């Protein structure tokens, strides 16, 4: 996906996708899951493809030192707008970096972070290995890598629920789909992504679902008062089988070996 594509997508992504109940639920569920694995603040966090900061700004509020990296000037401009509304002490804990995820090592000066996040970026990357390698090289030994990816095993659900039966039949063995933002996306499996991480000496610790019920029902008439209840249900589903296996996206958390912290 071309980097400049986000200049057209930044507004619908920030103003619609993240502002919706579904977007708020995604952010909250990922945050809860992250807090079970992150070291305590003021640990350093690199958010690769962090967009407008919806996932990393709450971490900065909690005391973490955050570097938000994104290749899109349009998305970083939205991050600057949102950051300007934060208290001074939160703004001081956030720095914005314009670069591709694949170039994160050079863009951050070779810094090693306590945690590296990459949520919702892999679906838009044709060649995932260079990005995964960069994520793993940016994390310190013993640090956490957190990745959210599109679930290749559930691609038939959405077209089936829309009664697009031909599309659903073809999706069982598909490796991607035409996404909700109008661009083609690529899907992963927990097992396949886990193997990519292990090749970089990063061992998977746990995996979760993220969207289950919220992806299947129309929440356009929902309001903010429902978010807390929806999050509670999605959190419970996210760690139980068979529910997590049916999630539209999955969240994989892994840890880098303590004795692996090679220079680049």
Per-region residue spans from a language model:
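Conserved class I S-adenosyl-L-methionine
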Residues: 1-41, 54, 58, 75-78, 144-172, ...
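Class I SAM-dependent methyltransferase SAM/SAH-binding core
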Residues: 46, 54-104
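A conserved beta-strand element that flanks and buttresses the S-adenosyl-L-methionine
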Residues: 117
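Short catalytic micro-motifs in class I SAM-dependent methyltransferases
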Residues: 120-121
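A short glycine-rich, Lys/Arg-flanked "PGG" loop and its adjoining helix->strand segment in the class I
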Residues: 129-144
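Short alpha-helix
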Residues: 183-201, 207
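A C-terminal cap/extension of S-adenosyl-L-methionine-dependent methyltransferases
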Residues: 206-264
């Amino acid at each position: 996906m071309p980097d400049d594509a986000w200049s057209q997508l930044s507004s619908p992504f920030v103003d619609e996708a993240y502002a919706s109940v579904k977007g708020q639920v995604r952010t909250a569920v990922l945050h809860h899951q992250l807090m079970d694995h992150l070291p305590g603040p003021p640990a350093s966090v690199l958010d690769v493809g962090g967009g407008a900061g919806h996932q990393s700004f709450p971490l900065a509020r909690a005391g973490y030192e955050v570097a938000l990296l994104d290749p899109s000037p349009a998305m970083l401009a939205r991050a600057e707008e949102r950051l300007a509304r934060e208290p001074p002490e939160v703004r001081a804990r956030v720095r914005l970096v314009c670069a591709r995820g694949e170039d994160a090592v050079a863009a951050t000066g070779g810094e090693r972070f306590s945690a590296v996040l990459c949520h919702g970026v892999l679906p838009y990357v044709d060649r995932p290995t260079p990005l995964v390698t960069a994520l793993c090289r940016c994390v310190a030994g013993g640090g956490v890598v957190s990745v959210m990816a599109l679930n290749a095993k559930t691609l038939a659900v959405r077209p089936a629920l829309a009664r697009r039966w031909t599309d659903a039949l073809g999706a069982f063995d598909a490796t991607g789909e035409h996404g909700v933002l109008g661009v083609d996306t690529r899907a992963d499996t927990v097992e396949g992504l886990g193997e990519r991480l292990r090749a970089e000496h990063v061992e998977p610790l746990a995996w979760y679902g993220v969207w289950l019920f919220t992806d299947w029902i129309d929440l356009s008439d929902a309001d903010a008062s429902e978010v807390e209840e929806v999050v509670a249900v999605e959190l419970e589903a996210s760690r139980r089988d068979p529910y997590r296996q049916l999630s539209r996206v999955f969240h994989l958390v892994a840890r880098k070996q303590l004795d692996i912290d090679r220079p680049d």
